[in-house]
Swiss-Prot record:
Entry-linked Gene3D superfamilies: PSTPO5379-like, PSTPO5379-like domain
Primary enzyme class: lyase
Recorded GO MF terms: lyase activity
Record protein name field: Putative hydro-lyase Atu3911
Cited SUPFAM superfamilies: PSTPO5379-like (SSF160920)
Endpoints of the signal sequence: none
Keywords: Lyase
Organism: Agrobacterium fabrum (strain C58 / ATCC 33970) (Agrobacterium tumefaciens (strain C58))
Top-level division of the source organism's lineage: Bacteria
Entry similarity comment: Belongs to the D-glutamate cyclase family.
EC number in record: 4.2.1.-
Length: 269
């Protein structure tokens, strides 16, 4: 999706810039509910010789991997937040080696320096449409509980591309049964940040055996009358890294996003 020029160099992005500054200074915390009204993004950084494989993977799997921006090789910058540094301005990073998680760190500068050809992909995040849902009176449980959103690896395979393969990851939010249609309608207006849910109820149908044991993030309460609603998730690329044995990658830690200067309205369909 092309961003209108009027949204670039957005002058009212002080909340987003302040949030990034706190992460640059060392704060580690999930970003749900932070800088409301601004688009958040997942990130995966790959060597140049893997970048085309991933671009094709994202094109074939736009629901979990909606690409918002791609950096030039070797550049830690993005037009989504002029002046930001992708090596330092996320609260928590993951370093991957040969498809295995090697390290979590609040500063990816040293890992980034290992190669001069790294390409960063910023991928839409469902945190972006949480603010409109809250404004519509729909509770977001992990925001209420100040925890991370629960995420699960499903049995739904993504379309492979080149050397990349893997299953879809989903995020889950408990929604009152009477508001599921509203949640789907609101999120569906934001196709660039995962859009409408991919599954409602019956978690076992998508390979989730126990909602109290998410693969990423934190478990949340599901109250009587609520239904688990699942959205495609930008942690899906990390599942591909693991399934494909990618030799080197840097990603955001699940729930710890890059906050852009772009208002969420820029991605409202």
């Amino acid at each position: 999706m092309t961003i209108p020029t009027s949204y670039l160099n957005h002058t009212d992005a002080e909340a987003a810039r302040k949030a990034r500054a706190t992460y640059r200074d060392g704060l580690v915390a999930p970003t749900s509910g932070i800088a409301p009204g601004f688009t958040q993004a997942n990130m995966i950084v790959l060597p140049r010789d893997w970048a085309f494989d991933f671009l094709l993977y994202a094109q074939r799997n736009p629901k979990p991997c909606p690409v918002l921006d791609v950096s030039d090789p070797g550049s830690p910058t993005t037009l989504l937040a002029p002046g930001a540094d992708l090596r330092t301005d996320l609260p928590l990073y993951r370093i991957w080696r040969d498809g295995k998680l090697a390290e979590e760190t609040a500063d990816a500068t040293s890992a980034w320096a290992e190669r001069d050809d790294l390409v960063a992909f910023l991928i839409g995040c469902s945190f972006t449409f949480e603010t409109p849902m809250v404004e519509a009176g729909i509770e977001i449980r992990h925001m209420t509980d100040k925890s991370n959103v629960p995420m699960y690896l499903t049995n739904r395979p993504c379309r492979p591309a080149g050397r990349l393969k893997g299953n879809m990851v989903v995020s889950m939010r408990p929604i009152p049964a009477s508001r599921v249609a509203d949640a789907a309608t609101i999120s569906g207006r934001f196709p660039a940040v995962h859009g409408a849910p991919v599954h409602v109820g019956a978690p076992e149908q998508i390979g989730i055996s126990d909602l109290s044991k998410p693969d990423f993030g934190d478990a949340v309460r599901i109250e009587p009358g609520e239904v688990p609603v699942f959205w495609a998730c930008g942690v899906t690329p990390q599942a591909a890294v693991m399934a494909s044995g990618v030799p080197f990658a840097i990603t955001h830690a699940p729930g710890h996003m890059f906050i852009t200067d772009i208002p969420d309205t820029a991605y409202h369909a």
